[in-house]
Amino acid sequence: MARLLFRLLVESNTPSPAIDNSTAALNSDLVVILAALLCALICVLGLIAVSRCVWLRRLAAGNRTVSGSQTQSPQPPVAAANKGLKKKVLQSLPKLTFSPESPESEKFAECAICLAEFSAGDELRVLPQCGHGFHVACIDTWLGSHSSCPSCRQILVVARCHKCGGLPGSSSSGLESEPEIEIRIKQGEDDPNSFLP
């Protein structure tokens, strides 16, 4: 009789397999829920960091325009590159007729806008700030909505100073002039595919 009672007591204290499965399922559900909450927390923190960066940049840009002092860190006007040129300024840019025999033709191989090679008799417009050349129709369309070179993004028209009418960064005396450096590269010398037949 004592053995029977001992056996019943031991069996009642031993957990059944059904109870083990339910606790394991509960633990795995808890792990999935905690992982989802952790991912959500990381996403929220990332969005907060991005919005804070945007807010700080807007605040810094607002302070720069309000104070009016751009002598500390002169930066090129980014908004000016998206306006486009006036027709008067556009017509003042130099044009030339492409001739394969001319020494100037070495600089111009193809139009970076339409990707067509220049042929004899094509009219090209050369941008004075960077020296890049394009078909007249291509670059006129581009410059109708942009104020920068499509190849190097050099801004073509720099805003003049409202007080003195001079260009930014230029000295009023004109005594100090930086020497111009011209670098010429022979055709095929800097071509990464020059090893190909």
Swiss-Prot record:
Keywords: Membrane, Metal-binding, Plant defense, Transferase, Transmembrane, Transmembrane helix, Ubl conjugation pathway, Zinc, Zinc-finger. Its main location: membrane. Coiled coil: none annotated. GO terms for molecular function: ubiquitin protein ligase activity; zinc ion binding. The keyword Nucleotidyltransferase does not apply. Residues 168-197 are annotated as: Disordered. It holds the Pfam family zf-RING_2. The keyword Transcription regulation does not apply. The RING-type zinc finger domain mediates binding to an E2 ubiquitin-conjugating enzyme. Belongs to the RING-type zinc finger family. ATL subfamily. PANTHER family: RING-H2 FINGER PROTEIN ATL61-RELATED-RELATED, RING-H2 FINGER PROTEIN ATL8-RELATED. It catalyses: S-ubiquitinyl-[E2 ubiquitin-conjugating enzyme]-L-cysteine + [acceptor protein]-L-lysine = [E2 ubiquitin-conjugating enzyme]-L-cysteine + N(6)-ubiquitinyl-[acceptor protein]-L-lysine. It is a single-pass membrane protein. This is RING-H2 finger protein ATL80. A zinc finger (RING-type) spans 111-153. GO terms for cellular component: plasma membrane. Induction: Up-regulated by chitin.
